Structure formats: structure tokens, C-alpha cells
Regions:
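A broadly conserved detector of short glycine/acidic/proline-rich loop/turn motifs that flank catalytic sites
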Residues: 6, 33, 41-42, 79, ...
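Short, functional N-terminal and low-complexity linear motifs
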Residues: 48-60, 112-113, 132-134, 150-151, ...
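Short amphipathic alpha-helical surface micro-motifs
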Residues: 20, 55-57, 94, 115-116, ...
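Surface-exposed beta-strand edges and their flanking turn/coil or helix-capping segments
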Residues: 50-53, 87-90, 96-98, 126, ...
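Glycine-rich hexapeptide-repeat left-handed beta-helix
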Residues: 169-170, 175-342
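Terminal amphipathic alpha-helical/low-complexity segments used for targeting or macromolecular assembly
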Residues: 1-115, 286-288, 292-343
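Extended beta-solenoid/beta-helix repeat architectures
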Residues: 101-117, 121-212, 228, 255, ...
Length: 343
């Protein structure tokens, strides 16, 4: 909690900045109504010399970080995040490298093949087995703390691997991939974002996909990310095919909501969307799978609400996590929305 003097200093600084910038539009970021950052367009910065804003010379602001943003990247849909992910990893590597006290010596262990090791960041407690290739020639590789990388793994940057991740033997990970905290992966993965606690521990191809938290992809689950005719991929967020929208992309795989699960040998079509807590066991599911679907087709029944909540608790407890009351409320609200829309 900020004391009143500090809060007043922040408010005063913001008011002074606005007065000196005049009527130009700037973007303020706040937490509990307290400003902690501001985005000032480049043209405004050129017109108003930032060093001329007197109060910024105060020692109070010397620890502030000024970041030049050449362009604004707008993320309207999840596939936009996939398009920016590789560049974002590179940016993160530049910011993280000076501050991380990692374990670079592990890259010199016999049997670990690191290409352009100066672009690889390894956190403390991470274990890398023999016969692992870390190829950072195309981009940085960021590996968090207490990660386990088993033998015969190949990782091509730019890639991000969060803390406590398990990468199983024989995994092939390609550029633009991010693995969230405590995820467990195997098989082939490219240009994919895993949120935390994802589970893909068996062979299967996954590319150009966004995978929510607590998702489990069964053995042999494969995802198509390119149409046979190489045309632009269209997606929909309901069963109404007339409401499909164009992604403008020729490569897009699976967009999977939290707690979604697929059975063994499931094959997802190009640009498939699944809602929250969907259970997909039809080997060729529809391109849109409702939240809490029990099967994966438009006419599939819904998973029972109480069983879905209890399953979420069970899955999370296996990773020593608890389903918060707020999370349970979100799941119940989504259940009401989904079942109502299907009536």
C-alpha cells in the first residue's frame, strides 16, 4: 500500500506532465487509480523535449525505466499474439539478460550442444541432459528456473521456457514458442503459446496454436495449421457458420480454452476454437467446440456443471494448486452462458 505522500507525488508528477504536453493524447496506466506508467507517442516526444520536463530530474524518478516503442502492436485476437511472439521473446531477452543470475556453465557440459550460447539464458536449478541441442542462431532462447530438459531434445529460438517446465525426451521445439509455468510437453511444437500448467506429454504435432491453462492434449493429438489449398484460414466463435471471420493468416492451428482436454488420437482441423473445459473425444471434432462440450460436435451434450468444477479441482490439486473461489465463479458463469446460448 502506498503512503499518502508517495501517492501525492505520483499524482502531482502526472498532472505536471499533462500540463507540459498540452492537449496531446497520452496513455496512462494505473493500478487502484494510481499512475505507474505512461505511453507518450513519438511525435509528442519530439515536439516536447522530455528532458525539459523539470520534475523528471527529481531523484524520485531516477530509477524509472524509459522504453522506446517504435510501433504499437495491436492484439485483437489470439492469433495476433502468435504473430508477435517471436519478436516479443527477443525483446524480453534484451531486458532479462543483464538482470538474471543464471547458470551459463550448464551450456558447456559435454553432450549439450549450444549454438550462439551468448543468446541463451538459463535460470538456476535447471537440468539439461546429454544430447540436447539449443540453437539460438535465429533468436534467443530463455530458459527459466528448475526446468528439466530430457535427452535428445532440439530447441530452435526464439523460444521462451518458464520455470518448472518439463520437456520430455525427443521433443522438437521451433521458433516462436512459449511454454508457461510448470507445463509438460513432448512431440513437435512450433510457434505456439502455452499458458501455465499445460499438459502435452506425448507425441503429436502442434503448431501456430494458443493453449490455455490446465489444458491436456492426449497422446497422438495432432493439429492441422495449414489448409490443403493454402488459402486464408477462417474461424468462428459459435456454431453459426455464417459468422465466420477471416484471420488473414494461412497458418493457424488450435485455440484452446482453459481446462480443455482431448482424447488420444484426436485430430483438430485448421483454425479450430474450443471453449473452456471442453472434453473432446470425437477424433474429428467440429471447428468450433462449445465450452463444457462432452464430445466435440455441435450436437454433443454438455459436461455436468458440478462434475466439471470437481474435475478442475482434482486436476489443479495434482499440481498443488487450489481452485480459487473467483475461478470457480468464472467457470460457473461460463457454464450458464454456454448452455443458454445453446438453447
Amino acid at each position: 500500500m502506498l503512503d499518502s505522500a508517495l501517492r501525492q507525488s505520483l499524482e502531482t508528477a502526472w498532472e505536471q506532465t499533462l500540463r507540459q504536453l498540452g492537449d496531446e493524447t497520452v496513455l496512462r496506466f494505473t493500478h487502484n487509480s494510481i499512475p505507474f506508467a505512461a505511453y507518450i507517442p513519438e511525435r509528442v516526444a519530439r515536439q516536447t523535449q522530455m528532458q525539459d520536463i523539470a520534475h523528471l530530474d527529481s531523484p524520485f524518478y531516477h530509477s524509472a525505466l524509459q522504453i522506446a516503442i517504435p510501433t504499437i502492436k495491436q492484439i485483437r485476437y489470439l492469433w495476433d499474439a502468435l504473430g508477435y511472439n517471436a519478436a516479443a521473446i527477443e525483446d524480453d531477452a534484451q531486458l532479462l539478460k543483464p538482470s538474471i543470475q543464471g547458470d551459463s556453465e550448464i551450456l558447456t557440459v559435454p553432450g549439450v550442444f549450444a549454438q550462439q550460447a551468448d543468446r541463451i539464458i538459463v535460470g538456476e536449478g535447471t537440468q539439461i541432459a546429454p544430447c540436447v541441442v539449443l540453437d539460438a542462431r535465429k533468436g534467443a532462447i530463455i530458459i527459466g528456473r528448475n526446468v528439466e530438459i530430457q535427452p535428445h531434445v532440439s530447441i530452435v529460438g526464439p523460444c521462451f521456457i518458464d520455470d518448472d517446465v518439463l520437456i520430455k525426451a525427443g521433443t522438437r521445439m521451433y521458433e516462436g514458442t512459449s511454454l508457461g509455468i510448470a507445463s509438460k510437453v513432448a512431440g513437435e511444437i512450433k510457434n505456439t503459446i502455452f499458458q501455465g500448467f499445460g499438459n502435452k506429454q506425448h507425441d503429436g504435432c502442434l503448431g501456430y496454436s494458443f493453449i490455455g491453462e490446465w489444458v491436456n492434449l492426449g497422446a497422438g493429438t495432432d493439429v492441422s495449421d495449414l489448409k490443403n489449398n493454402y488459402s486464408t484460414i477462417r474461424v468462428r466463435f459459435s456454431h453459426d457458420k455464417a459468422r465466420e471471420i477471416s484471420t488473414g493468416k494461412t497458418s493457424l492451428g488450435l485455440l484452446a480454452g482453459d481446462h480443455t482436454k482431448s482424447a488420444i488420437n484426436t485430430s483438430f482441423n485448421t483454425g479450430t476454437v474450443t471453449g473452456v473445459s471442453a472434453n473432446v473425444f470425437d477424433r474429428a471434432p467440429d471447428k468450433y467446440v462449445s465450452s463444457f462440450s462432452w464430445g466435440g460436435q455441435p450436437d454433443s451434450p454438455f459436461f455436468e456443471e458440478e462434475k466439471a468444477i470437481e474435475l478442475a479441482r482434482t486436476v489443479m490439486s495434482r499440481r498443488k494448486r487450489e481452485l480459487l473461489a473467483e475461478e470457480e465463479l468464472l467457470l460457473r458463469n461460463e457454464y450458464k452462458r454456454s448452455t443458454k446460448n445453446d438453447e
